[in-house]
Amino acid sequence: VLWQRASGRILEMGAGTGLNLPYYPAGAEIMACDLSKGMLHKAVERARGKNVRIIFCEADICHLPFPDGAFDTTAETFVFCSLADPVPCLREMGRVTKPGGQILLLDHVRIERPLIGPLMDLLNTATVRLAGEHITHRMDAFVRAAGLEIVESQRLGFMGIFQFIVARPGT
């Protein structure tokens, strides 16, 4: 499981209803942030009885209320596909991650295949309008534009529709 890589003090950005919380290592110390108070209430219920220490925080993930370098690991799952431009939030992840810490990202992205990629480009306008989902993001480019260093990148799922990236704050 991808989130087993998380260590130290962990920030989950866009925690939603807490679906990831059971997958963090036992004994983890997690700050779970989301803009939606309703989602956080559901996350609190889901977290009951888990072997992790969780603090919930209502916050805008692009303007976090934490000092620089406050977390060893920052993570997000399927959050940035809902943003037209995730670069400011990626910069914020870099800011609150300690030097030498890790940034874990999992999102759906554009499939880089001759027919599928252009089809996704055509469908993107509709998916943004109907569901608020940007299906043509190129996360590698966004991560680099935010000044972060990519340590590992894996395409997952059917034709690589998902991308898992491990990054760290730039030097």
Language-model segments: what does each one mean?
Residues 9-63:
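Class I SAM-dependent methyltransferase SAM/SAH-binding core
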Residues 29, 100-102:
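Short glycine-centered segments of the SAM/dcSAM-binding site in methyltransferase folds
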Residues 62-74:
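A short acidic, Gly/Pro-enriched loop at the edge of an enzyme's catalytic core
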Residues 72-85:
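A short SAM/SAH-binding and catalytic strip from SAM-dependent methyltransferases
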Residues 87-99:
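A short glycine-rich, Lys/Arg-flanked "PGG" loop and its adjoining helix->strand segment in the class I
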Residues 91, 104-162:
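C-terminal alpha-helical "lid/dimerization" subdomain adjacent to the S-adenosyl-L-methionine
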Residues 164-171:
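C-terminal lobe and adjacent flexible extensions of AdoMet/dcAdoMet transferase-like proteins
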